[in-house]
């Protein structure tokens, strides 16, 4: 028989997997974002592609970003109209958590927390 805890853990893992997005991550120098807040290169922030930004519906929510065996988190503060489906644009501090800034672009998985 399965325990309640095992079932809940399986449901949580499935929910996260279903909600996960895949796309290219690039970096930018933050300033005044579409959500109305000013940030800088050291801020843990992200700009979402137009579809995921959803006219600001996700402003100030946090996302988890995974790639290259690394994980980091960033707060939604801006729109990235040039990002493709699933694409995100992050502050240098966040990009550096996943890959060297010299790389410039890396494919990532990410999801809303």
Model-based region annotation:
Residues 2-113:
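Secreted/periplasmic proteins
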